[in-house]
Design a protein with these regions (language model features):
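Active-site-adjacent structural elements that line small-molecule/cofactor binding pockets in enzymes
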Residues: 1-212
Length: 212
């Protein structure tokens, strides 16, 4: 991270997998020329710890998750981690979140895989309250708890930006992702796309925002 800052890079991003099962049936969506999963999938450090170290070693470098599997962590715990990292880095954190592709991994960690974005939507509501309100109380489908206090609050107000990723499938961007961003996200993380494709996606997302 320090070397990246010295070279003039503006940001530093890390991925996330808490675990991967030793065997699983879900097909990895990012296979390359060798038609197999890359070794780094099994070698990822905890992103929040890695970024805390990166923040301490730098002064201007923006840091972010690309992406953190938000449904695999309890939102109260994650809200505190995000706020702490953003506070210690003086507002340099960007919160990229995803739902994950591996059903077996997600289910081991308590995710309702078929409805994982609904679960994440609840989690984001909880975290946004933790970041802005003196107390947070929630009664939903996936999370249910009485009023609690969660500190510290993040450096960025009202909260670090929440980004959602998407990839092109069949030559088209997912409109469902854009709708989520417009409804409760703060930004977009396009994956494996060229400038022209990104420009098309940005126009589509702006059109949805203008219609809402």
């Amino acid at each position: 991270a320090r070397h990246a800052e010295e070279l003039g890079f503006s940001s530093y991003w890390v991925p996330d997998h808490i675990i991967l099962p030793s065997t699983y049936d879900t097909e990895y969506p990012g296979k390359g020329l060798e038609d197999k999963e890359p070794d780094y999938l099994w070698q990822m450090p905890d992103p929040m710890i890695a970024l805390m170290r990166a923040a301490g070693a730098t002064s201007t470098l923006e840091i972010g998750t690309a992406v953190l599997l938000a449904g695999e962590r309890h939102p109260l715990h994650l809200a505190k981690e995000v706020a702490s990292l953003d506070s210690f880095s003086k507002g340099r954190f960007h919160f990229g979140i995803g739902a994950g592709w591996c059903r077996e991994e997600a289910e081991i960690l308590g995710v309702d895989f078929d409805h994982r974005w609904g679960q994440i939507k609840e989690a984001i509501k909880i975290m946004q309250s933790c970041w802005t309100d003196p107390e947070t109380e929630f009664h939903g489908k996936y999370y249910d708890f009485p009023a609690v206090r969660c500190y510290p609050k993040p450096h960025q107000k009202p909260n670090p930006p929440v980004y959602l990723p998407s990839i092109i499938v069949g030559g088209e961007w997912s409109q469902r992702v854009f709708k989520r961003i417009v409804e409760w996200g703060d930004g977009w993380l396009p994956v494996v796309a060229d400038i022209d494709q990104i420009a098309i996606g940005m126009r589509q997302m702006r059109d949805l925002a203008n219609e809402s």
